């Protein structure tokens, strides 16, 4: 059988650069070398594209991958049919690429930017297309679409950089008039809980908004929802399939960046500790959100389940983590799809889309 040429993109000019390196290491180690010619292409924090020439993918999370002597400068050409270009001395090497697997998170990576380049180049790629990627990355747009789809979610308030600069007092008063403390403060366009904070009083709210505005010009203030954090992995194009539910006990104030990637205090429960009826409701809502957002390929959909059984939508991630401890692959492994088979399925869905 003819091998497919798969370009795995990782890194990126993003606040979630390091998370991407961890995810990419896992993906590259699990892709079947008998089925695929693999081209690992990293984007540095400065925006340089590098065709990684090493064999040890552990160099990615170690941060030493850029120093590999066999690396070459690279680019994906927007010209259809040109594929992957790499540069060595005065020579340009062209490689046909059958599919791109973006293992990148956050701004410039998960928000439709990379997807737009691949769309122009005519190269199939894993994950949702441009419009869905952009909509899912912007939490305000996600909120509006989920609301139109009739999905219960936390009440929220938008604070903009311009409005906050014009009058902090008005912005803080508006939030306090609507919500009781604590509240969550989230940049509109980041993932992995980057820039997210829980504010318990006015001074903490002001500081959290200031910090979040460093990541995005729009910030969401959300009511605090007390409940179990439940996640569902979704796979598919026209007929998406939802995995079993998983639950996260963060062991912290909330499931922030440190709890996800640094601390070992979080505990995962697969399946989630919820009733069978609630499980089916969560899975149905996950697919409803997935379809409403126009997703294809994959996404992870996150919810809260309150003590009375009410299910509240939290957010959707179009390129979920693929690290060794990430929920997306773990949920499908528990649903009967091993990690390597999941990668095969995602590549097949990309070629079908």
Positions of predicted regions on the chain:
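ATP-binding N-terminal substructure of ATP-dependent carboxylate-amine bond-forming enzymes
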Residues: 1-131, 135-137, 141, 160-170, ...
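Hydrophobic beta-strand scaffold residues
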Residues: 38, 124-125, 153, 183, ...
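Phosphate-binding site of ATP-dependent enzymes
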Residues: 200-284, 305-312
């Amino acid at each position: 059988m003819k091998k497919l040429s798969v370009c795995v993109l990782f890194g990126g000019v993003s606040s979630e650069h390091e998370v991407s390196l961890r995810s990419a290491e896992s993906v590259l180690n699990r892709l079947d070398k008998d089925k695929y010619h693999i081209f690992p292409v990293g984007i540095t924090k400065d925006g340089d594209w590098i065709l990684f020439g090493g064999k040890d993918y552990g160099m990615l999370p170690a941060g030493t991958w850029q120093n590999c002597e066999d690396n070459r400068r690279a680019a994906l050409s927007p010209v259809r049919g040109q594929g992957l270009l790499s540069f060595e001395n005065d020579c340009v090497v062209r490689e046909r690429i059958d599919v791109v697997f973006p293992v990148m998170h956050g701004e410039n990576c998960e928000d439709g930017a990379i997807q737009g380049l691949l769309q122009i180049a005519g190269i199939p790629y894993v994950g949702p297309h441009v419009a869905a990627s952009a909509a899912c990355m912007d939490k305000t747009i996600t909120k509006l679409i989920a609301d139109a789809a009739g999905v219960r979610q936390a009440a929220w308030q938008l604070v903009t950089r311009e409005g906050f600069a014009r009058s902090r007092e008005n912005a803080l008063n508006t939030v306090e008039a609507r919500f009781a403390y604590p509240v969550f403060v989230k940049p509109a366009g980041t993932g992995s809980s980057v820039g997210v904070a829980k504010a318990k009083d006015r001074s903490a709210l002001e500081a959290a908004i200031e910090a979040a505005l460093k990541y995005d010009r729009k910030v969401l203030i959300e009511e605090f929802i007390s409940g179990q954090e439940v996640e569902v992995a979704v796979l598919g194009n026209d007929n998406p399939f939802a995995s079993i539910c998983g639950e996260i006990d963060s062991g912290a104030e909330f499931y922030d960046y440190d709890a996800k990637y640094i601390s070992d205090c979080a505990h995962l429960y697969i399946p989630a500790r919820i009733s069978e009826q609630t499980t089916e409701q969560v899975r149905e809502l996950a697919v409803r959100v997935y379809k409403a957002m126009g997703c294809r390929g994959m996404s992870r959909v996150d919810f809260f389940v309150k003590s009375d059984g009410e299910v509240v939508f939290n957010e959707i991630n179009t390129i979920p983590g693929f690290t060794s401890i990430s929920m997306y692959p773990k949920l499908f492994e528990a649903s009967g799809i091993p990690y390597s088979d999941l990668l095969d399925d995602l590549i097949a869905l990309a070629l079908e889309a």
